[in-house]
């Protein structure tokens, strides 16, 4: 029975990492689609979003079944609850990527204003994601504060893009769809950063970090 229990724990952890990798790939794909105006890639992003949602549901069911039937020890219960919250954040990141994709599909010719600024935002969030994944794989907290600092940088970039878009819109009589697309895409990327911060906080919960200025 113990071997079955250990194998199930390994399988759940493996699948949670697979979900993280798919969410990361989806983010990269959608930003490549934005830069290249590639609508076929957007369709793949929407499909990947659905896969992530299905994976989250399946993973949560397995975790709850294991808690109910296997009576895991305290440290494993803590890990399993962390995995549930991790899966939730990955689903939300997939949702944000899909939302960016839908923005591009609605935009004539796939034009996005302030593309370089938006891409800098996405690169920051991609780095945040990579560092959090490395921290969880290494069971380390070394990168967490760096991730939080980078999220502050993402927020600053979003505010800059937002102000620039408002300035551009203010001189127009009607709403400019290209301006609104830039605002929306930047906002979705900013939300991705927030989800990675949530991931960081749940990771600290799992490892037992009691730093009150991070865990809120």
Segments from the language model and where they lie:
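Cytosolic, long alpha-helical scaffolding segments
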Residues: 1-216
């Amino acid at each position: 029975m113990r071997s079955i229990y250990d194998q199930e724990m390994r399988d759940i952890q493996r699948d949670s990492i697979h979900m993280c990798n798919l969410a990361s790939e989806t983010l990269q794909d959608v930003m490549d689609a934005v830069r290249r105006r590639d609508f076929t890639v957007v369709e793949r992003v929407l499909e990947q979003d659905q896969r992530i949602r299905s994976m989250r549901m399946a993973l949560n069911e397995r975790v709850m079944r294991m808690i109910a039937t296997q009576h895991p020890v305290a440290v494993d219960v803590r890990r399993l609850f962390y995995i549930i919250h991790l899966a939730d954040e990955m689903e939300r990141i997939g949702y944000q990527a899909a939302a960016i994709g839908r923005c591009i599909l609605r935009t004539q010719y796939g034009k996005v204003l302030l593309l370089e600024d938006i891409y800098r935002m996405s690169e920051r969030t991609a780095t945040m994601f990579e560092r959090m994944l490395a921290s969880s794989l290494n069971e380390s907290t070394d990168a967490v504060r760096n991730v939080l600092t980078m999220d502050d940088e993402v927020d600053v970039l979003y505010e800059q893009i937002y102000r620039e878009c408002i300035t551009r819109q203010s001189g127009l009589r009607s709403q400019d769809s290209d301006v609104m697309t830039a605002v929306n895409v930047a906002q979705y990327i900013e939300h991705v950063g927030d989800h990675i911060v949530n991931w960081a906080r749940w990771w600290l919960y799992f490892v037992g970090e009691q730093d009150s200025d991070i865990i809120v």
